[in-house]
Amino acid sequence: MAIPTILDTDIGHDVDDVWALAFLLRCPELDVKLITTSTGDTVYRAELVAKMLQLMNRADIPIGIGIPLDENPHTHDVWLDNFDLAAYSGTVIQDGVGAICDTIMQAQDQVSLICIGPVPNIAAALARQPDICANAKFVGMHGSIHRGYLDAPKPMREFNVKVHALACRAVFEAPWEKVITPLDTCGNIVLEGERFMRIREAAEQQGPASPAAICLDNHLTWFEAVKDWPVLQHLDPHTQSSILYDLVAIYLGFAEDLLDMRSLPIQITPDGKTLIDDNGASVRCALNWHDRDAFLDLVTERLVSAT
C-alpha cells in the first residue's frame, strides 16, 4: 500500500524542488495527500506547484499556502508565465499549517512528511497540534554532518537549517521519527551525461506537460535567471542539471536501501549548525551512498517514463 505523504517545499528559488516534485509524482510508493509551500512568497510558490500539478493531471492533490516569511527572488517567472491559482482546478487551502495538522490527524497510516525547505510551517504545526508526532515521520533535506557544500571535507551551516534555525530545532526536538539526507549525501546529486540526454529526449518526445519537459524547461529558464550565481559559473545547462539536493529526501520517503543510514544524536544550534551531541535527539542520517548510480538511474527512469 502506498504511503500517505505530505510535501512541504520552498519551490521557486533553487530549481531542485521542481525536479523533486516531478519525481515524487512518479513514485507509486507515495500517495500524495497535500503539498504546502514554505517561506518567502508562499502564494507564488503555490502557483508553481499548481501549474505543475495541472500539467501532470494531478489536480486531485490539495495545495496549502504556508507562512510567508522572508524575501525570495522569483526565479521561475518565465516558466510560470501568467498562470495563477485561479486557474488551478484542485483545492487551495489558505491555512497550510492547519492543512498539515488535519491531513496527519485524519490519516489511517503513518504519514511521510517530506520537507525540502526551511521548516517554519512544521514548527507551527507542532505548536498547534503536538499530537501529529504520533502519526507522522519527518523526512528532511537538512543539515551537514561530516561533509559540506560541493563535497567539502567539513560540515557547514546548511541553508534549510540556518535560515530558520529555531524552527528547525523545534522540529528535530519533537518526539517523532526523524530521517534526513544532509549535504553528505544530497550535495553531489547531478544528472549529466547519458542520463541528462535521456531527460532531453523524453522532453522533446513527450511534450511540455511531461515530467521531463517540466524539469528541463524550468532548469533552462531558471538558469537564465540566476546564471550570475558564482556556483553556476562552470555549469553548462545543456549538458547537466544543477545539484538536485531535494531528490534524495523524496527517495527517503519510501526507501533507504541505497544509502548508509546511521542513528545519531543531533543538536541544532541557534546559528544553524547540525551537531552530533549526546544531548541531541536521535535522527536517522543518510551519511553515505551504497549505490548512488542506482539512485540516479531510478530518478532518470521515472522522469522519462511516459506513464
Residue ranges of model-derived segments:
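N-terminal acidic, glycine/proline-rich low-complexity segments
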Residues: M1-T307
